[in-house]
Amino acid sequence: MKKEVILNSELAKIADDLGHTDQVCIGDLGLPVPSGVKKIDLALTRGKPTFQEVLDIYLENILVEKIYLADEIKENNPEQLKILLTKLSADVEVVFVSHETLKLMNHDVKAVVRTGENTPYSNIILQSGVAL
């Protein structure tokens, strides 16, 4: 469920349409997008916008109950993981899956948001919560 305002119309539409347990992926510039899944390409140049910048906007604007991350981020991008985890509220469930599983999960997300991030395993699936 949406909490605030996003200026990008495609991002706003996805946030508006998220229901409880719906998912959206924010990915680095190399993450493949499955055929038939909406792709919102925000990449301007290598590194812009960053994964963290786009994640911040979504965390400010949607209620997240669960996230999925590639297990490989622990060894291959620990700094990105550390920063990311500090942004989550204590009640957000964190689930680690293989990178291959994360890519397969993208077949069922509402959209994949492509950033300019060029560090490994900077991909996350956000699962929408509900404010009751």
UniProtKB/Swiss-Prot annotation:
<feature type="binding site">
    <location>
        <begin position="121"/>
        <end position="123"/>
    </location>
    <ligand>
        <name>substrate</name>
    </ligand>
</feature>
<keyword id="KW-0119">Carbohydrate metabolism</keyword>
<feature type="binding site">
    <location>
        <position position="28"/>
    </location>
    <ligand>
        <name>substrate</name>
    </ligand>
</feature>
<keyword id="KW-0963">Cytoplasm</keyword>
<dbReference type="GO" id="GO:0062193">
    <property type="term" value="F:D-ribose pyranase activity"/>
</dbReference>
<dbReference type="GO" id="GO:0005829">
    <property type="term" value="C:cytosol"/>
</dbReference>
<feature type="active site" description="Proton donor">
    <location>
        <position position="20"/>
    </location>
</feature>
<dbReference type="Pfam" id="PF05025">
    <property type="entry name" value="RbsD_FucU"/>
</dbReference>
<dbReference type="InterPro" id="IPR007721">
    <property type="entry name" value="RbsD_FucU"/>
</dbReference>
<dbReference type="GO" id="GO:0019303">
    <property type="term" value="P:D-ribose catabolic process"/>
</dbReference>
<dbReference type="GO" id="GO:0048029">
    <property type="term" value="F:monosaccharide binding"/>
</dbReference>
<comment type="function">
    <text>Catalyzes the interconversion of beta-pyran and beta-furan forms of D-ribose.</text>
</comment>
<dbReference type="GO" id="GO:0016872">
    <property type="term" value="F:intramolecular lyase activity"/>
</dbReference>
<dbReference type="InterPro" id="IPR023750">
    <property type="entry name" value="RbsD-like_sf"/>
</dbReference>
<protein>
    <recommendedName>
        <fullName>D-ribose pyranase</fullName>
        <ecNumber>5.4.99.62</ecNumber>
    </recommendedName>
</protein>
<dbReference type="InterPro" id="IPR023064">
    <property type="entry name" value="D-ribose_pyranase"/>
</dbReference>
<comment type="subunit">
    <text>Homodecamer.</text>
</comment>
<comment type="similarity">
    <text>Belongs to the RbsD / FucU family. RbsD subfamily.</text>
</comment>
<keyword id="KW-0413">Isomerase</keyword>
<feature type="binding site">
    <location>
        <position position="99"/>
    </location>
    <ligand>
        <name>substrate</name>
    </ligand>
</feature>
<comment type="pathway">
    <text>Carbohydrate metabolism; D-ribose degradation; D-ribose 5-phosphate from beta-D-ribopyranose: step 1/2.</text>
</comment>
